[in-house]
């Protein structure tokens, strides 16, 4: 008995540092980014994943995106077509968020400046156009009045759905490129704010990277940008505290909050 | 006489019955009249119908057109525009919000004076912080349930020096730091152009 216990203990002691080392490797924000040749290169189609929550989270996410795509300042204007494929993640039963995402896509995709039109003439051969989007539903991590006891079960269901949706698009690669031009791969970027679904989806992405599933970690996929709610002035939210050392970028929207030296906190101006 | 709207929103997730009651109380309705409001529109939330109905019955007739609805799936944009007014026919009114960031942002973008009344009964009350921070910078009026008439007065002051949102960048040295969402996404994507 004692022998088995010692062996188990030794094994744990030996493998734990290796696992932790692996974790630090994949969780450091300085992990490798893929080299990209142009924003709309057909060989490197980009994939952006956006997580919407209910009520305030959705409102803030869309306010932030709307501000970015309609910005009068060309340096700050987000060109929606730079992201060939967009995946919107919503919680089950949240038809309002789905409606908002659809409205945004219909508004943002046709926005094009003179500069884009000019660029279109020159770079037509390498421009893959506006691409498309999809809205994916995942089960709720926790219903509003659900008892805490069953929360792990529903969270696990949500985690499994998140893993599935992250794996929905993967490609074989050739020299670091998609094997087929225009083929959608893992998300390049995950953009989220604080709903519970976001925490679970980010966890799912970390698990995939931990095991380097289909080379997602080697290829620098699924970089994560977390934007703390604008309503958080003095204290971080629970999701924020959980994710502050896990995401690649952790942005807060009030300068006084950035003074809290937590994880990767940074203040780059108000974003909504 | 031109109409003038007061639009009240209590939010979708946690209905704020006290706010519904407060805006239908006699002192507040009198204050509305004193500031020449003609219409009061209330979004009372999922389970707020009963509270709304009984408060309207108690208020009786008072010279203000009162209307209410549960929730609008199409969003609050329509009501915000109504409160913003259209010049001669409809004067610019006011928005009273439960301090949800969505409605505050909508009102700030449309530059309608807004009174923010946080629900102090909510457990995790970061909305008070938002209301305080925004009131300090004179973007909104921080209202209290007990004295909404005073807040209505303050809103008239706010109307005269309404600030625009998003805040304009001040100074060149700040622009280097403020790259916006696009700058951050570009950094993460590693675009070379």
Locate each region found by the language model.
Chain A
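N-terminal signal-anchor transmembrane helix
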Residues: 26-50, 59
């Amino acid at each position: 008995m004692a022998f088995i216990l010692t062996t188990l203990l030794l094994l744990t002691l030996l493998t734990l540092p290796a696992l932790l080392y692996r974790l630090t490797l994949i969780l450091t924000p300085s992990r490798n980014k893929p080299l990209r040749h142009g924003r709309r290169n057909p060989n490197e189609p980009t994939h952006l994943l956006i997580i919407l929550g209910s009520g305030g989270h959705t409102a803030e996410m869309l306010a932030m995106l709307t501000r970015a795509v309609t910005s009068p300042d060309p340096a700050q204007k987000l060109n929606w077509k730079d992201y060939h494929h967009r995946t919107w993640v919503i919680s089950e039963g949240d038809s309002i968020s789905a409606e908002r995402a659809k409205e945004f896509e219909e508004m943002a995709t046709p926005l094009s400046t003179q500069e884009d039109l000019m660029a279109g003439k020159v770079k037509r051969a390498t421009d893959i156009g506006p691409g498309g989007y999809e809205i994916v539903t995942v089960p709720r991590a926790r219903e509003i009045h659900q008892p805490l006891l069953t929360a792990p079960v529903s969270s696990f269901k949500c985690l499994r759905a998140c893993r599935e949706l992250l794996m929905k698009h993967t490609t074989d690669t050739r020299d670091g490129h998609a094997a087929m031009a225009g083929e959608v791969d893992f998300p390049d970027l995950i953009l989220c704010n604080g709903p519970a679904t976001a925490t679970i989806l980010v966890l799912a992405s970390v698990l995939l990277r931990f095991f380097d599933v289909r080379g997602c970690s080697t290829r620098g996929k699924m970089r994560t940008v977390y934007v703390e709610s604008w309503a958080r002035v003095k204290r971080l939210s629970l999701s924020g505290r959980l994710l502050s050392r896990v995401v690649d970028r952790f942005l807060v929207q009030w300068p006084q909050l950035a003074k809290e030296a937590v994880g990767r906190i940074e203040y780059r101006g108000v974003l909504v | 006489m031109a109409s003038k709207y007061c639009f009240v929103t209590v939010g979708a997730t946690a209905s704020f019955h006290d706010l519904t009651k407060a805006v239908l109380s006699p002192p507040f309705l009198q204050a509305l009249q004193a500031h020449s409001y003609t219409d009061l529109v209330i979004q009372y939330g999922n389970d707020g119908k009963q509270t709304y109905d009984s408060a309207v019955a108690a208020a009786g007739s008072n010279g203000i057109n009162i209307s209410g609805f549960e929730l609008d799936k199409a969003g609050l944009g329509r009501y915000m525009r109504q409160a913003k007014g259209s010049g001669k026919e409809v004067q610019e009114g006011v928005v009273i919000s439960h301090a949800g960031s969505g409605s505050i942002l909508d009102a700030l973008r449309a530059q309608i004076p807004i009174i923010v009344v946080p629900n102090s009964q909510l457990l995790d009350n970061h909305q008070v912080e938002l209301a305080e921070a925004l009131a300090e910078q004179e973007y909104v009026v921080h209202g209290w349930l007990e004295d909404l008439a005073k807040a209505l007065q303050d809103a008239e002051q706010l109307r005269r020096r309404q600030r625009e949102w998003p805040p304009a960048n001040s100074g060149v040295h700040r622009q280097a730091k403020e790259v916006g969402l696009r700058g951050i996404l570009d950094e993460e994507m590693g675009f070379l152009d």
